[in-house]
Regions:
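N-terminal segment of the mature soluble domain
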Residues: 54, 58-140, 177-181, 185
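N-terminal post-signal-peptidase region of extra-cytosolic proteins
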Residues: 37-38, 112-119, 150-159
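Short hydrophobic beta-strand segments
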Residues: 48-54
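C-terminal/domain-edge helix-coil "capping" segments
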Residues: 29-48, 125-126, 138-143, 159-228
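Flexible, solvent-exposed loop segments that connect beta-strands
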Residues: 99-108, 148-158
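Bacterial N-terminal signal peptides that target proteins for export
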Residues: 8-18
Length: 228
């Protein structure tokens, strides 16, 4: 009886519930595309490692260290797992050659660096076979809607609706330390729509574009490095 009374006097609750379920489904949908351009043969031995470094030379953005760590951590999972040297550990050990202002931009710069005995020795100590340069960022666009919050004698509440689109775009360039050459590039682009409906309490429905970009890129990189 109580349920019927509620639905009789507040039929909009049912509509809102259906709308929220629909939005949850939409928010969980992220479109991710992967492009691979191979320029050389690849493969890796059990005693060899990969280091993933974020590009941070751009004036308007930096590749987030959290994304770099995410890709590296996922590459250590499952079948054909890759040994990953943590970015900060590598940069600290190689100081000052891999700081943002001094890091090699081209393979010929790496070739010049490898003539330094200390650089070559530390590469050998880490067992580095490949350096992966990650470059990119996640951008939020197409914001729309509005939410207003009020406080009154009966309490506080927020009402309204907002949405936005997130686009995560990253490139991974793979350098072979053995041959001092660029052996390929993998690009990922993930897009998704996020929503923020508010009926008394705001309920964020977030598209996990960066997490999806990380997962897909890590899987592709692992296959690429293994020569699959």
């Amino acid at each position: 009886i109580y349920t019927r009374t509620i639905m009789k006097h507040y039929p909009e609750i049912n509509k809102i519930g259906i709308a929220l379920l629909f939005l949850v489904g939409l928010a969980s949908c992220t479109t991710t595309t992967i492009d691979e351009f191979r320029q050389g043969e690849t493969g890796i031995e059990n005693n060899e490692s990969v280091v993933i470094l974020g590009r941070r030379q751009a004036s308007d953005y930096e590749t987030r260290s959290e994304f770099v760590d995410c890709v590296g951590e996922r590459m250590t999972r499952g079948d054909d797992a890759i040994s990953i040297v943590p970015e900060q550990e590598f940069v600290d050990a190689m100081f000052p050659w891999f700081e943002p202002r001094t890091a090699p931009l081209r393979t010929r710069d790496l070739e010049r660096l490898m003539t330094e005995d200390v650089v070559a020795d530390r590469m050998t100590e880490f067992g580095i076979r490949y350096i992966v340069w990650l470059d990119g960022f996640t951008e939020t666009t197409d914001r729309s809607g509005s939410i207003s919050c009020t406080i009154g004698p009966g309490g506080a509440g927020c009402f309204g609706f907002g949405s936005w689109e997130d686009d995560a775009n990253f490139d991974a360039r793979v350098w072979d330390v053995g041959s001092l050459s660029n052996v390929g590039t993998i690009s990922t682009d993930a897009t998704g729509q996020s929503y923020l409906p508010a009926l008394v309490i705001p309920i964020p429905l977030i598209a996990r574009v960066e997490a999806n970009a990380c997962s897909r890129l890590a899987t592709q990189l692992k296959e690429f490095v293994n020569g699959s």
